[in-house]
Amino acid sequence: MAAERQSLVNKDAQSAAIPTAPWAVAQPSPRDPSRWLPQAIAHRGAKLDWPENTMAAFRGAVKAGAHAIETDIHLSADGVAVISHDPSLKRCFGVDNRISECSWEYLSALRTVAEPHEPMPRLKDFLEWLTHPELEKIWVVLDVKLNNDPTDLMAAIGRALDSVHGPVPWDQRIVVGCWNASFLQAARSQLPSYPLAHIGISLLYSHHFLRVPNLGFSLNQMTLVGPAGKLFLRELQRTDKLLMTWTVNEPRRMEWCIRQNLGHPRHPRTNSEGPAIIDGVITDNPRLYREICEKFEDEMDGKFVRPKLSFTQTVKNKAETLTFVLLTQSWMVLYHVLRRWQGKFDFLKDRQTLDKR
């Protein structure tokens, strides 16, 4: 692993770093600027109330108070960037076909199984909606899926971005999320002005991206709990990396994310007190997350006193956390081995530097 990490550092990496995403960092609390609250990022829109990854879900996310929207990109058979999490149409649209085998004309006629039976949007449709003046501050995380050729998919994303012009340049509103080295390299080639983030579920794999200048991270929250996660968080803070975490739906997990930003001496991005470790919380329930933020601040301000846990409950919570950490670490190793065997986790030592375009 040390040799793989060393391969990321070269002269080219110092000359043309990946752009940063200052709009995506944790925000200072209006109550106390020393508190840095992770932004609320709606996972596939407001998917608890609307069919996921539809325009209705995106509109619902904004109404729920989300600062940003996370959504997923696939490529149709005729080269159109479309929004869907699954490569198959079965779960959401009830059709046993794959997106990559269907034309946009066919896909556009489908409706979700879940009511109110929404159509699949193109990335272009989503961007056109985002041009509305009242949505100017809403930003986006694109989860670029691995099921297509990376160059073809990034080129299709680029065509969609070029076809729609908004009040703020898209490279100042969009973070492009990539799972592996091949897709990161394609993004650097096709979308050189856009901030990038590595999406990860295995710290064993994610670790070798740490030394890529300005590369953000979007990591499964389960992997960040426990000793290995703590070390990874410390390294992200030391190198001032953007960090988003997913999918955080339980109040305890939401509060854990908020508390990671407490007790640090200085914010490196703004030279002010209270650095953020976690910049964004990707959740199915942005409204609940905003409520948890308010409750957390009430506690910090002395307006709310948390009931003291009994000894039995304290022991139970610690046992649950230990079990959670052990299961997560075991699952992470198995997942890492599986994805390497499938050829999905390629390393940067096998690619050109991300900073050579």
Feature locations, PLM:
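Metal-dependent phosphodiesterase/phospholipase catalytic core, i.e.
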Residues: 17-32, 37, 85-200, 219-220, ...
